[in-house]
């Protein structure tokens, strides 16, 4: 993502945590942890115009109204309600939640992953130095995979030294994207043939993290806030002592089988993955810089989810 997109995402986190603190303050004690990550998102918020701040606030309020209907402990619990912005590097460690909401006295915690005008799941990379199979599945990549991709990335290393720009490569899809993705597909198939259900399960855990969460997406052009539940371990949607949630969130199961993985029709830079239980992903590979570098970035999206992933939308109040 661009620096502007990153700043917008951080500003949205600031709007959300502060509006949540304001709304939830009624009849209870709130603690917003002022850690280094909080000051980073506050700085991004300060770069917005007044009109942008108004939009972000409206989106946050709409999302908060939905979250409190799904999680009654936010408003009904005893003790201090702690709110915390997580550091960006948590995602590399398997925790993609941006905001944590906690009640330490009852050992309760939920997490939110916030997106501003985009639906990407993750932006992983492929390179000659990254063992994606080890990172995704905890299974080292095969020698065949390295033998196929290393010559391509060595060529990119030479282009980098010559300061050649990506736009100057007229055949990058045929000579770079397609063969790298072909090796990527072959490696996943090889691992699945050998290790079966471990591969799809660990892939989804890598992409979505090891903690349950709600994904909250601000769609500014539609003036909508969307929420998706990722309740893979049954930790979301708990009742408070006073009431149950307004909407029931079922537990979603991890996949156990790869149905198919192949190139998207008529594409040389996008792979589609179909798993059982309704999970579907797309992996679009692209360059993320002007000058060629020996590293390529994925734009990974969920294009299909199980019926147990609840998707809700709410319009902003004018």
Curated annotation (Swiss-Prot):
Judging by the UniProt lineage, the source's domain of life is: Bacteria
According to its UniProt record, what is one Pfam family this protein matches? Answer: RE_HaeIII
Show the catalytic activity: Endonucleolytic cleavage of DNA to give specific double-stranded fragments with terminal 5'-phosphates
What Enzyme Commission number(s) apply to this enzyme? 3.1.21.4
State if tRNA processing is listed as a keyword. no
Q: Which keywords belong to this entry?
A: Endonuclease, Hydrolase, Nuclease, Restriction system
Q: Listed GO molecular functions?
A: type II site-specific deoxyribonuclease activity
Q: Please name the top-level EC class of this enzyme.
A: hydrolase
Q: What GO terms in the biological process aspect are recorded for it?
A: DNA restriction-modification system
Task: Return the protein name.
Answer: Type II restriction enzyme HaeIII
